[in-house]
Amino acid sequence: MSKPRVLVVGGGVIGVCCAYYLSKQNVDVIVLERDAIGKGASYGSAGVIAAGHPPMNKPDRVRQALKRVLDSTTPLYIAPRFDPSLAAWLWRFSANCTERKLTANMNVLGPLGHATLQLFAQLIAEEEIACDYQASGYYEVCRTEQGTTHARRDVALMRAHGFDAEVLTGEEIGDRMTSLKNDVMGGAYFSDSATCDPYRFVVEIAERVRRAGGRTETGRVVTKVEGGAHPAVRLATGERFEADAVVLATGAYSLQLARELGCRLPIQPGKGYHRDLEFGEGSRPPLEAACVLGETSVFCTPMSGRLRLAGTLEFSGLNHRMHPSRLAQLTASAEQYLGDIGPARVTSEWCGLRPCTPDGLPVVGRLPGQTKVFAATGHAMTGLTLGPITGSLVADLVTGATPPSTEVTALAPARF
């Protein structure tokens, strides 16, 4: 008896994790990627596995960010333009920025965060994934009283859901992170977290898929997904691939493919940036551990001998145009906390599109009206963090290995 065939559309962290766990369930899996494996939004993320960190819809942070939303030097920026779909999305997003919704989201994301940490540990140990994985946690460092207040709230919220987190004074942070300026007022430490090189992680997982007999095909642009009892995908080349099931793990590009199946996923592309710095041969990045800069939401992550500055959230459409001012803001933000970070050589400047939902939760499950087409998208800034648990959940949904849990039901596309 032949194995069931599953097509996974998208070769980022979500797609390869879905393929990996499907391959563990005796499935013939093929990953179809439009570009190269791991070269989309996964490539340039901050590399922080921030399990349990509160989602986008934190009311206090959102209210603060929306006051300067048209200022291109702030963490959240909306490019002025006529875009009815974005306006509708923002309306729904603001309606979800309540304490009640935040608590509901954490009730879903908390268990997923604990599960994904276990899966990461298993992957690193059992598959010997070489991705500069460091289970050293990360810091939130703040220079203002408002920032430290936000950090204390993050700690309280994460502790309430079983994650190890502690509030730190400025002096305590300075003792642990000696490269920071001495005007840091306080912050937090989240030990139930880790860091890695996200691109290497994706490439390594894709290699394990191939070792298990799966295929990864690059340069394969999927233009249409056909549903029904015998699903299939059509490529830009005119080719047609049939399968027993299809998984859409196409990030910010999921909207169009799902729409043709009658499903309107309210996903907006949130552009993020990174700038990688190297500090000369034999030198190490000027940080002992990863940290997020509380007032600017910029992550500073030591990664494979370099320092990655990553962050910002920009709504400017489905494009990869980079704005120099956004890149410059990354360095300017880091210098507020680290001082002069030169002499450093810029080795990479990048932007990518994160798929953002208005309620702050990913979209995982069967598309409405379909029995064999599944979505795995909408992770915003948590794609790397939730990659393994998403892959495991999707594999169970596709194969029917276990009944859907409460968390999976909350992520279903039908909620929209």
What would you call each of these model-derived segments?
Residues 4, 167, 361-416:
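C-terminal lid/capping helical subdomain adjacent to the catalytic/cofactor pocket in oxidative enzymes
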Residues 149-161, 180-237, 241-244:
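Helical element adjacent to the flavin cofactor pocket in flavoenzyme catalytic cores
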Residues 2-12:
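Beta1/beta-strand and adjacent pyrophosphate-binding region of the FAD-binding site
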Residues 46-168:
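Dinucleotide-binding Rossmann-like beta1-alpha1 core, especially the glycine-rich loop
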Residues 46, 193, 297, 315-318, ...:
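Glycine-rich phosphate/pyrophosphate-binding beta-alpha loops
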Residues 47-49, 53, 57-96, 222-231, ...:
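Active-site substrate-recognition segment that forms the wall
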Residues 104-117, 140-150, 175-176, 188-207, ...:
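Short beta-strand to alpha-helix junction loop
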Residues 24-43:
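Glycine-rich FAD pyrophosphate-binding loop
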